Amino acid sequence: MNFQENVTLAMALFTILTSIYFFNKAQQ
């Protein structure tokens, strides 16, 4: 796994986690 793949993976995980976080906040 090279640096570019790590950055892409980190960005994808961050986006997914942020989406879940805001979705949960909106539900309350």
Swiss-Prot record:
Subcellular location: Membrane
Main localisation: membrane
Keyword Transmembrane helix attributed: yes
Single GO cellular component term: membrane
Keywords linked to the UniProt accession: Membrane, Transmembrane, Transmembrane helix
Membrane topology label: Single-pass membrane protein
Parts of the chain that traverse the membrane: 7-24
Top-level lineage group: Eukaryota
The protein's name: Small integral membrane protein 47
Organism annotation: Homo sapiens
Gene coding for it: SMIM47
